[in-house]
């Protein structure tokens, strides 16, 4: 099972990726983890990537694709792999196609943006214990206070509404076009393209997992 998982930030990709990887016995691969591992291992590609990152620059698509090819040749990818957050742009998808990286499925977890904003901007946490709450779905007994200690809850910068909206704008501009890219490719060239499936990412975690596994069995 070789697949790409697509979806906006806050769509619940990480949770579903864990279930899918467990079910198929495949590793979850994110470009961040892959870069860190290559740099740590000191591979030639890792050294190149480190030099670029140390200079404060973005790692080129060519270098990322070479890292991807290296990574999926590892023994733990024998049964397949799941890409999370890659490709992020059309040029990366084109480069992956040109490099002959074979895929079985592209699965999109679709959640309306207003639901994502509500989901993320409502999160609150108690930093000392790691306890988390949600103002609507899992509120504390006393507004703004931790249930156990009574201490103030915080809202992480990443969860502030403006930050969430900005991340969704970047996703719309850069990554959302991949939905069109892969669905069109599947329609026009079904023999070579990965199967494209979209599922709703609203509902309970169990419901979404059932939808995801059903889509990948189809």
Swiss-Prot record:
Catalytic reactions of this protein: AMP + ATP = 2 ADP
Chain intervals for the UniProt region annotation (LID): 122-159
GO cellular component, as recorded: cytoplasm
GO MF: adenylate kinase activity; ATP binding
UniProt binding sites for ATP: 10-15, 123, 132-133, 203
Annotated spans, Disordered: 127-147
Protein location: Cytoplasm
Main enzyme class: transferase
Residues that, per the record, bind AMP: 31, 36, 57-59, 85-88, 92, 156, 167
This protein's record includes keyword Hydrolase: no
Keywords assigned by UniProt, alphabetized: ATP-binding, Cytoplasm, Kinase, Nucleotide biosynthesis, Nucleotide-binding, Transferase
Region feature (NMP): 30-59
Oligomeric form and interacting partners: Monomer.
NCBIfam families: adk (TIGR01351), PRK00279.1-1 (NF001379), PRK00279.1-2 (NF001380), PRK00279.1-3 (NF001381), PRK14527.1 (NF011100)
Family: Belongs to the adenylate kinase family.
Protein name: Adenylate kinase
Lineage of the species this protein comes from: Bacteria, Pseudomonadati, Pseudomonadota, Betaproteobacteria, Burkholderiales
